[in-house]
C-alpha cells in the first residue's frame, strides 16, 4: 500500500520522489507478502525489517500495532518487553492515532481480522483505511465527537455493532439520526447513512453503550469518484 499507492495521493510528483519522502522506520510481520524489490528499496533507505513469521496466531496488523505500542511504552516508561492487550490498553498517549493503510478492501477475511484488531486495541485508536472506506471503533459507554473532513469524507457513512447488540445509540450530525435506538446484526444497523453536519458545527456526535464501528466513504481521498 505505501509503496504502490502512496504516489497516487501526490500525482504532481514522480512515484520515486513520493516513495523516498515516506519511508517507514520498520516493517513488521510475516513478510511473506512483501515483494523482494520493495524490501530491497526500503532496506536501502534504512528501514529495519522485523520478521515475526514464527508467530502464526496473530495477524500482521496485530503484530505491527503491538510493536508500535511496545516501542512507545519503552520510551515513556524506560522499560520494554512484550505487550499483551492489557498493556496496550493502558491509555498510551490518547492523542495518538495509528492509521492502517490498506486494511480495508481485498479479501473479506483479512478485513474482518483487521476489524477484530481495531476492537482489541480500541484504546490505541487504530484507524483502518482502504481505497473507499475509513473505519475505527467507537468505544462502549462513551460520547464522542467526530469532525469529518467533508471535502474528502462522505457523504456515505455508517455505524455497525460488530461485537454484539448496542442497546441505546444516539447521534447528531447524520441525515438519519438515532434517538436511543438499539442496533444489532440481523436486525437494525445504521449503514447507508450520510453526513449532515451543517447544523452541528461540523461535527458528528455518537453516544453508545456498546462498541460500534464507525465508517465513512473516502473515495475522494484517492481521486476516485465517490459511488
Tell me what each language-model feature is.
Residues 33, 55-56, 132-134, 165:
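Short, solvent-exposed coil/turn elements at secondary-structure transition points
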Residues 101-103, 129, 160, 207:
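Short beta-strand segments
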Residues 1-122:
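Acidic/Gly/His-enriched mid-domain segments of enzyme catalytic cores or analogous surface patches
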Residues 54-58, 78-80, 125-129, 186-189, ...:
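Short, surface-exposed, polar/charged, turn-prone segments marking secondary-structure boundaries
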Residues 13-27, 121-125, 147-151, 156-167:
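Structural recognition of alpha->loop->beta junctions
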Residues 138-227:
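Long, charged alpha-helical interface segments
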Amino acid at each position: 500500500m505505501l509503496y504502490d499507492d502512496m504516489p497516487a495521493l501526490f500525482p504532481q510528483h514522480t512515484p520515486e520522489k513520493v516513495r523516498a519522502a515516506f519511508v517507514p522506520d520498520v516493517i513488521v510481520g510475516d513478510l511473506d507478502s512483501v515483494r523482494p524489490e520493495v524490501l530491497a528499496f526500503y532496506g536501502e533507505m534504512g528501514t529495519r525489517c522485523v520478521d515475526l513469521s514464527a508467530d502464526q496466531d496473530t495477524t500482521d496488523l496485530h503484530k505491527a500495532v503491538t510493536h508500535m505500542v511496545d516501542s512507545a511504552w519503552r520510551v515513556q516508561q524506560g522499560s520494554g518487553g512484550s505487550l499483551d492487550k492489557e498493556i496496550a490498553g493502558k491509555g498510551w498517549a490518547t492523542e495518538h492515532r495509528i492509521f492502517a493503510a490498506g486494511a480495508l478492501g481485498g479479501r473479506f477475511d483479512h478485513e474482518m481480522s483487521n476489524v477484530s484488531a481495531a476492537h482489541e486495541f480500541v484504546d490505541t485508536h487504530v484507524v483502518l483505511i482502504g481505497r473507499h472506506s475509513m473505519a475505527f471503533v467507537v468505544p462502549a459507554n462513551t460520547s464522542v465527537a467526530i469532525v469529518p473532513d467533508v471535502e474528502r469524507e462522505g457523504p456515505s457513512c455508517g455505524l455497525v455493532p460488530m461485537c454484539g447488540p448496542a442497546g441505546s445509540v444516539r447521534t447528531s450530525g447524520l441525515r438519519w439520526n438515532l434517538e436511543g435506538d438499539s442496533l444489532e446484526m440481523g436486525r437494525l444497523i445504521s449503514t447507508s447513512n450520510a453526513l449532515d453536519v451543517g447544523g452541528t458545527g461540523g461535527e458528528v456526535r455518537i453516544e453508545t453503550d456498546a462498541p460500534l464501528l464507525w465508517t465513512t466513504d473516502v473515495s475522494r481521498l484517492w481521486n476516485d469518484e465517490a459511488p
